[in-house]
Regions:
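N-terminal export signals
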Residues: 1-3, 9-31
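Solvent-exposed N-terminal domain segments of exported/luminal and surface proteins
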Residues: 62-200
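Hydrophobic residues positioned within well-ordered beta-strands of beta-sheet architectures
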Residues: 117, 223-225, 236-240, 252-254, ...
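Extended, loop-rich substrate-binding clefts of extracytoplasmic carbohydrate-active enzymes
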Residues: 192-245, 363-378, 382
Length: 530
C-alpha cells in the first residue's frame, strides 16, 4: 500500500504560492481569460472518442512510463516536508477569473507521485493542453526551481472553491486516486477508478494510473472530468461529473469503460480506500492516547432485496477479506458515523469531520459481491481498508466492462430514507454477569441503534425484540433496552465460541415482522481482556 501512504501525506498539504506569469499572445480570448497558464493548440474532443482510444490502447502492448535518472533522483528528494515548501500560484489556476467557475490548481511531482500527467481544458467541444510552466511554482526549501526540468509536467490537480480559492474540495493525484473534502471540508478516505487483484495471495495488486485529463467547467461551480486510464492489464475511459459543493453532500456521476489487455483475476469496481486503526470496538488493543483513530468506522450496505447492513471495521492483526454476495445492490459505502469530537480528541486532523462515501449503482449491476479488505496496521499513516464491487469470475483479455454509478461524499452516515435505525456504536467486553465468575472464552457485545421509528418504542412495551444469529457459537444473556435519556436502543448479548470454526454474527431489532434497525454483522475473534 505504498502509493496510499504517500498520497495520504501529500494531500494533507494544500496551499497557495505567489509567482507571477503571463499567457503568451495569440491565444483566443476565452483561453486568455480562463487559463493562467500557456495552452496548446485546439483539438476536437468527445467522450466517445476517448472510449475508442482506450479500446485501441488495450490492443497494444503496455508502455510503462520512463523517468530520466536525473529527474528520478530529484523526485526522490521531494518528500512530505520538501513538498510543503513548493507552492502553486493560485492566480495561475484554470478558470481563476471566470465568475462562478471552480478554479483548478496543479500539483508538483514528488516521490509519491513520480509520473507526470497531461491536462487539457475543454471549451465549446475543443480541448487545449495546459502546458507545464515552471514559473507556476514557488520553491521555498532545499529544492530550487533550477533543479526541476522545464518540461517536468504536472502530478495532478485540485479543485478550489469558487468563492474561496484558499480552500479546495477535490483532488486527483497518484495512480487513479481521487478524493473530496466533503461537506465538512476535511479530507479523509479516497476513491479509485478501478482495483485490480487486491489482496490476492497468488498475484500482486496492480495500480493502473490516469495518464491524461480533460477538464470542462460547468455552470454553478461544477466540473466535468474526463480521464484516460492505462496499466499493464487494462486501459479505460472515465467520466466524472461533479456537482458544486453544498453543506450536505458532494455528488459525482461516474461512467467507467474498461478494456482488458490481459486477464484480470479480480476486478474491483468503484473501489474505496480508507484508514481504520481503532474505535470503541477494539479500543483495548490501541497504543495511542486518543480514544479513537479512523477515517471510517464501518461498511454500510443496502442490498438489492432492501436489507440494510452495517459491518463495523476491525483491525484484527491479520489480512482479512469479507464478501457480501448480492444481486443488483442499491448501494454500499465506507462511513464515518461517529461525529463527536470527544470520540477522537484531535484538533489537528479532525476525524469527526471526515466524509462518508456512498456508491449508488446506476443501471443493472447483476450478481456479484461487495468485498471488504482489512489490512492490519499499527499507525494512522497507513490506508488499510478497501471496499469495492466485484464478481467471482476472471475477466479474460479482450473484454469490455462498463459501469455507471453515483458517488455521494456526505456526512449523514446513512444514505437514503432512514426507514430503520442505524448502528451508532459497537462495544465489547468480558462475557458473564457482575459478581460472578467471568469465563475467558466468551465476549459480551453491546450494540447501540438510533434513528428511524425506533425512538417511538419504550422498553416497557415489550414489543421490540432482539434477533440474533451466530455460527459456531452459543448466545446467552441477550436483551434489548432503551438507553435512558436518549432515543437510542441497546442490544446486549454474550457469545461463547464452540471451537469448530469462525464465529459469524448477525443481529437486529424488530417489532413483530417489522425490522426496526439495520442488520449488524461482525466476526467474533478472541481478545485478551485481562
Amino acid at each position: 500500500m505504498t502509493t496510499d501512504i504517500s498520497r495520504r501525506k501529500v494531500l494533507a498539504m494544500m496551499g497557495a504560492v505567489t509567482a507571477a506569469g503571463l499567457l503568451p499572445v495569440g491565444f483566443p480570448a476565452w483561453a486568455q481569460q480562463k487559463a493562467g497558464l500557456p495552452l496548446g493548440g485546439a483539438k476536437s474532443f468527445s467522450f466517445e472518442g476517448l472510449i475508442s482510444w482506450a479500446r485501441h490502447l488495450a490492443t497494444q502492448p503496455y508502455v510503462a512510463p520512463v523517468i530520466a535518472p536525473e529527474l528520478a533522483s530529484i523526485l526522490s528528494e521531494i518528500d512530505y516536508d520538501a513538498f510543503q515548501d513548493i507552492r502553486f500560484d493560485v492566480e495561475k489556476s484554470l478558470w481563476r477569473n471566470s465568475a462562478g467557475a471552480a478554479p483548478v490548481a496543479m500539483f508538483h511531482r514528488h516521490q509519491g507521485a513520480r509520473e507526470s500527467v497531461r491536462l487539457h481544458m475543454i471549451e465549446n467541444g475543443e480541448a487545449r493542453e495546459v502546458l507545464y510552466d515552471p514559473s507556476a511554482f514557488a520553491y521555498r526549501g532545499d529544492i530550487r526551481s533550477d533543479d526541476i526540468p522545464t518540461d517536468a509536467g504536472w502530478a495532478g490537480f485540485r479543485v478550489l472553491y469558487a468563492d474561496d480559492p484558499a480552500r479546495d474540495w477535490l483532488a486527483f493525484m497518484g495512480s487513479s486516486y481521487f478524493r473530496s473534502a466533503g461537506p465538512m471540508n476535511q479530507y479523509g478516505l479516497s476513491a479509485r477508478a478501478v482495483a485490480i487483484d487486491t489482496a490476492r495471495a497468488d498475484r500482486r495488486e496492480e495500480f493502473p494510473r490516469f495518464t491524461e485529463f480533460w477538464l470542462e467547467s460547468l455552470s454553478g461551480g461544477g466540473l466535468r472530468i474526463y480521464a484516460l486510464l492505462d496499466g499493464p492489464s487494462i486501459s479505460g475511459a472515465v467520466r466524472i461529473e461533479c456537482d458544486a459543493p453544498n453543506d450536505q453532500d458532494i455528488v459525482m456521476n461516474v461512467s467507467v469503460h474498461l478494456f482488458t489487455r490481459q486477464a484480470v483475476a479480480r476486478l474491483g469496481i468503484a473501489p474505496l480506500t480508507s484508514m481504520f486503526w481503532f474505535s470503541e470496538t477494539n479500543r483495548d488493543e490501541a497504543a495511542d492516547w486518543r480514544p479513537e483513530i479512523h477515517d471510517s468506522d464501518g461498511l454500510a450496505l443496502w442490498t438489492g432485496s432492501g436489507e440494510r447492513i452495517w459491518r463495523p471495521l476491525d483491525n484484527s492483526g491479520h489480512l482479512r477479506t469479507s464478501s457480501f454476495v448480492d444481486d443488483n445492490p442499491r448501494g454500499f459505502g465506507l462511513m464515518q458515523r461517529d461525529r463527536q469530537f470527544a470520540s477522537y480528541e484531535d484538533d489537528g486532523v479532525f476525524y469527526e469531520r471526515r466524509p462518508d462515501l456512498w456508491i449508488e449503482p446506476v443501471g443493472d449491476w447483476g450478481t456479484g459481491m461487495v468485498q471488504l479488505v482489512e489490512i492490519p496496521t499499527d499507525d494512522e499513516i497507513f490506508d488499510n481498508i478497501v471496499a469495492y464491487w466485484t464478481t467471482d469470475q476472471e475477466i479474460p483479455a479482450g473484454e469490455e466492462v462498463q459501469y455507471d454509478y453515483r458517488m455521494h461524499w456526505m456526512k449523514a452516515g446513512m444514505f437514503g430514507p432512514a426507514a430503520v435505525a442505524g448502528v451508532v456504536a459497537s462495544r465489547l467486553g468480558r462475557a458473564g454477569m457482575p459478581g460472578k465468575a467471568r469465563p475467558k472464552e466468551g465476549l459480551k457485545y453491546a450494540i447501540d441503534f438510533e434513528g428511524g421509528d425506533l425512538a417511538r418504542y419504550q422498553t416497557a412495551d415489550g414489543v421490540v425484540k432482539p434477533h440474533i444469529t451466530v455460527r459456531n457459537a452459543v448466545v446467552d444473556n441477550s436483551y434489548a433496552l432503551r438507553v435512558v435519556g436518549t432515543d437510542r436502543w441497546r442490544l446486549v448479548f454474550d457469545v461463547y465460541p464452540d471451537g469448530v470454526g469462525p464465529v459469524d454474527m448477525r443481529a437486529f431489532l424488530a417489532a413483530g415482522d417489522k425490522p426496526l434497525t439495520e442488520t449488524w454483522i461482525f466476526q467474533h475473534r478472541e481478545r485478551d481482556l485481562g
